[in-house]
Design a protein with these regions (language model features):
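Conserved C-terminal helix/linker of AAA+ ATPases
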Residues: 6, 10-46, 83-84, 203, ...
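Conserved P-loop NTPase "ATPase switch" module shared by AAA+ and STAND
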Residues: 132, 155-174
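Short glycine-rich substrate-engagement loop in P-loop NTPases that contacts/grips substrate
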Residues: 125-155, 178
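Walker A/P-loop
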Residues: 87-126, 150-154, 220
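Pre-Walker A (pre-P-loop) alpha-helix and adjacent loop at the N terminus of AAA/AAA+ ATPase modules
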Residues: 51-94
């Protein structure tokens, strides 16, 4: 319930709306949702499986992506509970944007994310297909859409990682880059339950890229920031790397 005269952050308002709308679905729009009222929070907390998840948890920093994965796994378990109660639901959009400077583990995390989703039933294959502009934009008219569709086909059941996605922008209407972006948006919708698309790059450039494409923006579920490591985190990373190789560092 929104209190008069109180200020709210955008995430808080979204949470209030989600809670209200969920209650509306259960009690007024779809009476069959009444049974879901008995589901307790602890019942939908997933127990993640797989070595990829364990590796991710050991990584230094990246708390935001860890929270995103927890949310995705919990929602997947909730979907299973819904199905057991006879409630038909489609898988929510899982496409993401990773922003950060080089060396902040974006590609490494994307690869682990693909495997985690496969280990826990969200994806069928769990592989990573990494592409850039040269993989998506054709040399001649009519080639670009075909290139994009081939990469989506290759990534089916896994994660399509589009690095430096803003390089697709040509700043002129009707360009091959525009054709690539429009086809990507179409394929994201057509295969929303079959793969996850991750757009990655520098924060400022990625923000500009997303803002210029409303259709793309509406299909992104999570925006994950990868901040630069501080001195303490770099020391922790060095210690972990040394431990894996049997090397012990002294003070």
């Amino acid at each position: 319930k929104i209190q008069e005269g109180k200020g709210y952050l955008v995430p808080e308002l979204r949470g209030i709306f989600d809670s209200w709308y969920d209650q509306k679905l259960k009690t007024e729009i779809y009476p069959q949702y009444q049974d879901v009222l008995t589901i307790k929070a602890e019942e939908i907390k997933a127990i993640p499986k797989g070595t990829a998840y364990e590796r991710l948890q050991k990584m230094v920093g990246i708390s935001q992506i860890k929270a995103v994965i927890e949310k995705a796994l919990n929602y997947n378990k909730l979907q299973k509970i819904y199905r057991e109660k006879g409630i038909k639901t489609g898988r929510p959009v899982m496409h993401m944007v990773f922003t950060g400077n080089p060396g902040t583990a974006k590609t490494t995390v994307a690869r682990l994310l693909a495997q985690i989703m496969q280990d826990n039933g969200l994806l069928s294959r769990g592989h990573l297909v990494e592409v850039g502009r040269s993989d998506l934009v054709g040399k001649y008219v009519g080639w670009t859409a075909k290139c994009v569709k081939e990469k989506f086909k290759e990534a089916k059941g896994g994660v399509l990682f589009i690095d430096e996605a803003y390089s697709l922008l040509d700043n002129r209407a009707g360009s091959y880059g525009d054709e690539a972006i429009n086809t990507i948006v179409q394929e994201m919708e057509n295969h929303r339950e079959e793969l996850v698309v991750i757009f990655a790059g520098y924060p400022e450039k990625m923000e500009e890229f997303i803002q210029k494409n409303p259709g793309l923006r509406s299909r992104i579920a999570f925006h994950v920031s990868f901040p630069d490591y501080n001195e303490l985190e770099l020391c922790q990373i060095a210690q972990l790397m040394g431990k894996e190789k049997g090397i012990e560092f002294t003070q």
